[in-house]
């Protein structure tokens, strides 16, 4: 059986109760879409694939300034809607406001403060988690976040995606691995909990490269790790780039488990793993189509026997079953 430091257990031990993250869309945009850093965004990104139904996606309909000014009440509404949904089963549950959609530090600092404080004003919200790009957190904002972390539970979730600079260029990420490393270290130095998000199976990254990067993860002050398999979804650049898809590893569940049973034991045992997979809506997902919910995959992984030492894992297929996309 695979053992690891589970996020659910870690957060429950920290607060002494069941805690649920509620995803919210605060109306942010992305500097890799609007021309500040780049245009078009990352090749795999379709924000609709991870937005819950209770989130209101305002991106693109009004200006960035208007979105942020309108969002404080909207944030409270989304949190109350999320609370209503989860409290039916767990009335005593506490909540973390998860700023998930797009780049949640991309805006005027005073506007950002209003949004974060609005979330914390909601009853039974005991902390916030802020997802953002490694190149979108200023020293001024870190000063505020450091102060905020003394008042509430705060996690900064950085979309690192990979530590390979060649891959970062291919996926049009718009930042370097050095940028990711520096912000992780700087955030940790402020006493703020750091979460790193990585995608496994990006163009050119097979088993060997994925496992190589575990050493980089272990060398950095990362508290929480979020992993997920690469998925090709509608409305993305990657959907229309069969040349890049051919360089990706589109795992089957069995192949992904086989990778993770080697990946997990290599991690520092103090690193908390929050998730292993992403589950895009069926109507948007092109490949790979697993037909599994996240918890179902995790159950399969946890039941998998630990591989014996010295075992050489079978090689992954070079195209991960990509051809079926175009049949």
Language-model features: where?
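Core AdoMet radical
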Residues: 49-82, 86-109, 124-137, 153-179, ...
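Distinct, well-ordered alpha-helical segments
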Residues: 109-117, 138-147, 210
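Conserved C-terminal portion of the radical SAM core fold
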Residues: 178-238, 254-277
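Hydrophobic faces of well-ordered beta-strands that scaffold small-molecule active sites
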Residues: 20-24, 95-97, 128-130, 154-158, ...
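Structural recognition of alpha->loop->beta junctions
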Residues: 118-125, 212-227, 297-313
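Acidic (Asp/Glu)-rich catalytic clusters
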Residues: 86-88, 116-123, 143-153, 185-189, ...
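Canonical Radical SAM [4Fe-4S] cluster-binding loop centered on the CxxxCxxC motif
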Residues: 15-74
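Auxiliary Fe-S-binding modules of radical SAM enzymes
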Residues: 2-9, 13-20, 53, 224, ...
